[in-house]
Amino acid sequence: MKKFSKIFFYLTAVVLLSWLLPWLLQFAASKPGNDPFTLYSCVTKRFAYIQSSKDNGVKRYDANGTEYTVAQFDSILPTFYYRQLFSKDRLPDTINGKEVTPKIIAHGNFTFKQSARDVNVTKPALNMIMESMPDRIDLENPIEAFRTTDRITFIDMRDNTVNEKKSALFDKVMKQKGFEFPMRTLSGNPTNRKEYDEGYLMVDNNHRVFHVKQTKGLPYVRETGVAPELGIEHVAITEFSNRKTLGLLTDKDNNLYVLNRDYTLHKLPIDKYDPKTNTLTIMGDIFYWTLKISDERGVTTYAVDADSYAFADSLRYDYPETALDKWSKYIFPFELSFTSYDDQWVKPRVSMGSCWVLILNFVLAALFYSM
């Protein structure tokens, strides 16, 4: 019994130390590391970024290393600093042959961000649905939700009753259009804090992508024509102010696509993007999209043409390796953690260090035990 108690004590100590020691070292020695704020310039046709440090303060450069003053930096990024330029009467009338005004620029600008924590979540069983064509100008808060099994069922949230008539109507139309239940995934944004509503993008059991929304209480169902062979696995509805795009899609091979409102599909000319492990940030304007794909080692930034989605440029920024990153795998044979930046679940996670450290620990433990 005494021997069992010792074994239990040592095992408990190992588990606790494998969790606490790496956490304490990370807490005490880690330094914040942020990638520079980067955008693609429609003027210089190069990336421009802001670099800040304790020694040099805030500096502004382009990809060639040319340093800019604040005013010059505003001028090479006119679609981002258009308010500042307009207030100083420095906003040009045309850029690259296109007429520009504050209204035109604001209408074309958008920001999109999706992290692994947004994707790696338990999907709700119920999804709210809005009226896409309300009687008034402003969108109204949703009063109904739906769930999907081998059919779609609508529930009135005011009294928690099933709307059999609407359920049967939507189910009939969706199946007539070729929708195969059960549904694999969907994306929507049921809030009235937006300019318009496009309902949901849904991926059926056969990997076909459908556009589903409610207009005047009736079903609007369209198959988008995305090839099922692509194996679309993740969708994100956009609803940007310019109303050009409908959503962003990724397939089984982690290729990223943009789906326009006319249901034309365009593969973006970037390397692989895995929604389960990467963070995607897009800052777009009427000339270019700047896409940033972040991973644990750094950030790759791409620029694509806003009209043709053609590749313009790319830039890689690797996070500086700290002494903690370099030596932690040689200090700890394994680490235990319960949370991750990639999801919102709390569960045990074990990451292994160097095998030689594990062997050395066993040798030291044996020597200590023999003494």
Question: Where are the predicted features?
Answer:
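Short extracytoplasmic
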Residues: 43-71
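Juxtamembrane interface at the cytosolic side of transmembrane helices
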Residues: 2-11, 348-371
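Membrane-proximal low-complexity regions enriched in glycine and acidic/polar residues
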Residues: 215, 220-310
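A cross-kingdom signal targeting lumenal/periplasmic-facing segments of multi-pass membrane
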Residues: 97-173
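Short, aromatic-rich amphipathic segments at membrane interfaces
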Residues: 310-359
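Alpha-helical transmembrane signal-anchor/signal-peptide segments
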Residues: 22-52
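Repeated scaffold domains used in trafficking and secretory/extracellular systems
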Residues: 36-40, 75-96, 101, 123-142, ...
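Hydrophobic membrane-insertion alpha-helices, especially the h-region
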Residues: 6-26
